[in-house]
Amino acid sequence: FIFSADNGTSTRIVSKQKDGSRVRGGKGSPTYRGTHVPLVIAWGDKIGGKTSDRIADLTDIFPTIADICGIDIPEEWDIDGISLFPEINGEEPLEKDLCLVHFNPLWPTTPAPYASRYAMNDDYAYFWDGRIYEYKKDPEFRNPVMYADASEELKAAVADLKARVDEVDFYPDMPGQPRRSDYGTFYDFAPPQNPF
């Protein structure tokens, strides 16, 4: 049994935390509260009773299922995810340094005016335009970290995050630019034919 979600809860929902604080949902936004979701994996008496605060995303589901089933994924597929099975099976976890978040909703009635993209590691989120946030302390992404004041360690992390953001093509819209696309142009795009 694998349960997760594709976005945070509605902004109309305010959840009370164990410490008494209240957190408003962030669905429909590229903030930490809009993209941070639970991941629950259960398998009878084989998997359960463990928690992890490791960085993971939905690209990890396919390799995890393949690993559980004993299926090798061909290297030429060049997938982004890793198997979480070693960790949930009590073995040494595979390393995952960062996740990429691309936000470009194509809502038919009230489209978001801008696309956005960032890469995040265990501590920081680096946006396409150079903004850096310490997202656990600033989940709404309101107070960017000043790069000029950053430690050498943070500058090295930013270089890795920036490389990930820059290596993926932007389609259909460039972050920060007014939208060029809508449902019609997005879905009229003719992708290459599937070779399988």
Predicted stretch roles:
Residues 33:
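Ligand-binding/active-site lining segments
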Residues 9-21, 25-30, 47, 54, ...:
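C-terminal cap/loop subdomain of S1 sulfatases and analogous C-terminal strand-loop tails that border
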Residues 4-5:
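Generic enzyme active-site microenvironment
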Residues 43, 71, 90, 163-171:
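A structural signal for alpha-helix termini and helix-coil/disorder junctions
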